[in-house]
Amino acid sequence: MPSELRSPRLAVLIDADNASAKIVDGLFEEIAKIGEASVRRIYGDFSNPRSKGWADTLSKHAIIPQQQFAYTTGKNASDITLVIDAMDLLHSGRFDGFCLVSSDSDFTRLAARIREQGIDVFGFGEQKTPESFRQACRRFVYTENLLAGAANSQDAASTSKPLQPSSAATPIIMKVITQMESEDGWVPLGEVGKQLANLASDFDPRTFGFRKLSDLVRRTNSFEIDHPKGGSMRIRTKSAAGSPPKSKTVTKTAT
């Protein structure tokens, strides 16, 4: 019998000093959409009261703590240990992807190095995370979007305040549509979603208060929407819809 397709095997490495324990339920729900969290480790000084929140969640999610005492002020042994473990796991050849949970730009080079090896990196951090780390990941998820109540409606905006207004998504969606170079301006929404992920690793409809890209597009009121019979939803910019066809310039010959 043919073997069943296996979910991507993931290594989840959490920086306890730069991630809140409040995200843990949403974090593993999000990771489950990507693959199987085969390794779950968290790094920090759990003798510190700041890490107590994480200590209370470890058993529920089968997270293995990697205790690192802060012997010297200003030296982060936890970060170093996380990087060493990540490289050991990378060279084991057993993983299809890594989930790095931190808002610390110090992990930018680690993410880039893992991707150089042809392995996907999924980052999870707060909106304040430096762009260098966000863009080093194949995909970056803002942890504010993982909290209970964040964009929890299936079809409309959440009652909680979004991280950014829906209008802020318009320029990047327009940019993608332009890059796709459709003759009549119409592009499939599914393809737009794929290109958005390639262009901006941290693009997420939930950041703007919506679970689905289609709902976000409708709310911006900047796009024409079409549902072809038997086809998928497609969109184009309203400016493209109202633009007259280009006319040829006729040069008069002097007589």
Question: Predicted regions span which residues?
Answer:
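Conserved phosphate-handling catalytic cores of large alpha/beta enzymes
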Residues: 134, 138-151
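Short, structured coil segments at secondary-structure junctions
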Residues: 61, 117, 135-137
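Domain-level signal for Mg2+-assisted phosphodiester chemistry and nucleotide/NA-binding surfaces
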Residues: 1-91, 120
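Short, well-ordered beta-strand core segments
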Residues: 65, 98, 139-141
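P-loop/Walker A NTP-binding module and the surrounding RecA-like catalytic core of P-loop NTPases
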Residues: 21, 40, 108-112, 117-122, ...
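Short, glycine/polar-rich helix-capping loops at beta-to-alpha or helix-loop-helix junctions
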Residues: 50-55, 125-134
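N-terminal regulatory modules in eukaryotic regulatory proteins
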Residues: 156-255
